[in-house]
Amino acid sequence: MSDAPWEMFANRLRKRAKHLAKWARREQVTCYRVYDCDIPELPLVVDVYDSHLHISAYAREDDEKRDDAWLELMRVTAAAALEIPPERAVMKRRAGQPGTSQYGRVDESGAYFTVSEGGHRFRVNLRDYVDTGLFLDHRVTRARVGAEAAGKRFLNLFCYTGAFTVYAAAAGAVSSTSVDLSKTYLEWAGENLRLNSLDRPEHRLVRADVMEFLARSGEPYDLAVLDPPTFSNSKKMRAEMNLQRDHVKLIRATLDRLTPGGVLWFSTNFRRFKLDADALGAARIEDLSRATLPEDFSDPKTRYCWRIVR
């Protein structure tokens, strides 16, 4: 068998796709991870979104070997191995480690399309932004939040495109408030609500700095999701945020908005994150990182997740 990198890559993709096929059909999952830096020499992440591919190439010290021609070879190899038209396979260079999120625009194609997950519909865009609009590593977490949402007042902080809000609203949350600084992502969240016939007055979208919102909001909530970026120095924010340094303040401020016994789902993709549980003053803290890791994700450090009860 040849040791050519593209052949190793193709063989691994075919093997993983075959392994995941039965699970994906059974769970009605059409968006999933099929390759996650499985071969050390090939630091790529490949996600399937229906009949499209989103491929991320992560920076490494020996990056001079991975020029544009190499990336193009990997792109067409992935498309061929997974029997997807090459024009539907998107390759992006990314800095940092897999699991880091970088908000930002990289193109202007306007190439949105709709995918399904858990009986809900979501808009995604594989070309124009660093991320796609739907974080696949939160698939199980979204379902868990939805399972708790009936009859609850729901708060979604750093809401991105509002996928958690869709799950909560569809499950019967009596109201929801989704907060983000980005006008683009709030509009996207609004479109996701509309796609699911959930664009009603009780589901509010608020453009605000999260800490400022928490400081001024007196409204009580029963269930919340807090999934902040690792770092943020947005000009619109009052102060630069460093999650490791600031997480206690951020979590406590969120818990203050919850009713007694209210539940906060807190998550981060920061691989070196350490939760200061003793400083939170919570009634109960459960580490559900492994319990919420989807079937198609093998790296336990993809993201961390806690269920925190006030």
Predicted segment positions?
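Non-catalytic accessory regions of SAM-dependent methyltransferases
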Residues: 1-52, 58
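Non-catalytic substrate-recognition/targeting regions of SAM-dependent transferases
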Residues: 40, 44-47, 70-135, 143
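Conserved class I S-adenosyl-L-methionine
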Residues: 151-160
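Conserved SAM-binding motif I beta-strand of class I
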Residues: 175-180
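S-adenosyl-L-methionine
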Residues: 181-225
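C-terminal catalytic and target-recognition region of SAM-dependent MTase-like enzymes
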Residues: 263-310
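Mobile active-site "lid"/loop adjacent to the S-adenosyl-L-methionine
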Residues: 185, 207, 221-253
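Conserved SAM-binding loop of SAM-dependent methyltransferases across substrates and taxa
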Residues: 161-173
